[in-house]
Amino acid sequence: MPFSSTHNKHKLKFSAEEEFPDLSKHNNHMAKVLTPELYKRLRDKETPSGFTLDDVIQTGVDNPGHPFIMTVGCVAGDEESYEVFKDLFDPVIQDRHGGYKPTDKHRTDLNHENLKGGDDLDPKYVLSSRVRTGRSIKGYSLPPHCSRGERRAVEKLSVEALNSLEGEFKGRYYPLKAMTEQEQQQLIDDHFLFDKPVSPLLLASGMARDWPDARGIWHNDNKTFLVWVNEEDHLRVISMEKGGNMKEVFRRFCVGLKKIEEIFKKAGHPFMWTEHLGYILTCPSNLGTGLRGGVHVKLPKLSQHPKFEEILHRLRLQKRGTGGVDTAAVGAVFDISNADRLGFSEVEQVQMVVDGVKLMVEMEKKLEQNQPIDDMIPAQK
C-alpha cells in the first residue's frame, strides 16, 4: 500500500541492495524490467505529488504473476509518474503493447461512422456486446495515490457532469455507500457494477483505500450507458446491450464519451492525454485508447479446436472467462475482446473485434456440421 514520501526518505537510510525486492519467482512485466541498477537510479525520485518507485512497483512485488495472463506489475499514481519513472515504464509499455516505442505517437478516432459493419453479429451466438474505456481527470492524483479529499472532489465533479446529460443519456448516480448488500450484489451479477475490492492487484496498489467512500455507478435510464466512478480509474465509461449489435453499442459509446469530455473541458478539467501515450490511465496496460470492446460469445466447438488459441492470437483478440479476467468460461461462453490498447485507434480496435468474432461464429457453424475450418484460419493481423 502506498505510503507518503516521508516514508520513502526513511527507506533511503538503507542501501539500494538492502531494499531491492526479491523478484526471483515473478512473472510480470515490471519484474522483467526492474534491475538492481535501475532500482538504485530511480528509488529516490518522486513525482510532484510524492509518488515513489516503491509505490509504482508494490502491486507487482506482492503479486508475482497470474497463471493465464502476464500481468503488468506496476501502476501510476499521477500523470507525472509516466515521465518521472519512464526508464521503468517505457520498456514495460514496449513489452506489453507489442513493441510500442518511446518515440511512437498514438492515434485517436472516436468517429463511430468509420466502423464498417458490426450490426449483423448472429445473436444466437453473440449474447451481449460492450465497449469500455477509462478516463483520468487532469489535476488529480490517480486512485493508487489520491487522498480522500481528492477522491471526493473527483466524485463531485463527475456527478455534476453526468447529471447534466440529456436524451438517451439521461440518468442518475448511485453511490456505493447508499446501496444495500443485495443491491450491490445484483448489480455485480448483472455485470453492471465493479466487483468488491478483493482483487489482490487492487488491494496491493492502494486503490481500495477508504472503500466505499466516494465510489459509485452512474447509468442512463435504460442501463445501456454506465460510468463507474473511482474504481481503478477516475472514470470507466461503458456502453453495453444484449445481442450482437456492436455498431449501436459503439455509436452510443462515442457520442456519450464526447459529451462527457466536453462538459469536463468546459469546467476547466480536461482528461489526461499525451501525444505519445494517448489517454493516461492507472495501469500501463490500458494506456492509449483504454478501450476494450468485447462480446460474450458461445463457441462450444471452436473452443475445443486445437487451433483456438492460435486463431485468437492471429486475430489480435484475447479471451476471458464469462465473469471477467480471473474466471472460467461457463457453458462455452467466452468474453472475447481486442488485445491491443495502444498504437491502434478506437475504430481499428472495435473493427478487429467485429471482424474477428464474425469469422469465429462462421467457424463454429462449420464445425457444427462436422466440416473442416483449416482453410478459414486467418493470417496474422
Curated annotation (Swiss-Prot):
Q: Which residues form the signal peptide?
A: none
Principal place where this protein is found?
cytoplasm
Q: Where does ATP bind?
A: 128-132, 191, 236, 292, 320-325, 335
Q: Where is this region: Disordered?
A: 99-118
Reaction catalyzed:
creatine + ATP = N-phosphocreatine + ADP + H(+)
- Localisation per UniProt entry: Cytoplasm
Tree of life domain: Eukaryota
Q: What class of enzyme is it?
A: transferase
Checking SUPFAM superfamilies in the record gives:
Glutamine synthetase/guanido kinase, Guanido kinase N-terminal domain
Question: Per UniProt, what is one GO molecular function of this protein?
Answer: creatine kinase activity
Residues in domain Phosphagen kinase N-terminal?
A: 11-98
- One Gene Ontology biological process: phosphocreatine biosynthetic process
Keyword list, A-Z: ATP-binding, Cytoplasm, Kinase, Nucleotide-binding, Transferase
User: Could you tell me in which tissues this protein is expressed?
Assistant: Predominantly found in skeletal muscle, but not in the heart.
| GO cellular component terms given for this protein | cytosol; extracellular space
PROSITE patterns, sorted: PHOSPHAGEN_KINASE, PHOSPHAGEN_KINASE_C, PHOSPHAGEN_KINASE_N
Q: Which residues form the Phosphagen kinase C-terminal domain?
A: 125-367
Q: What is its EC number?
A: 2.7.3.2
Oligomer and partners: Dimer of identical or non-identical chains, which can be either B (brain type) or M (muscle type). With MM being the major form in skeletal muscle and myocardium, MB existing in myocardium, and BB existing in many tissues, especially brain.
Family as reported in the entry's similarity comment = Belongs to the ATP:guanido phosphotransferase family.
- Put simply, this protein is called Creatine kinase M-type
Which lineage? Eukaryota, Metazoa, Chordata, Craniata, Vertebrata
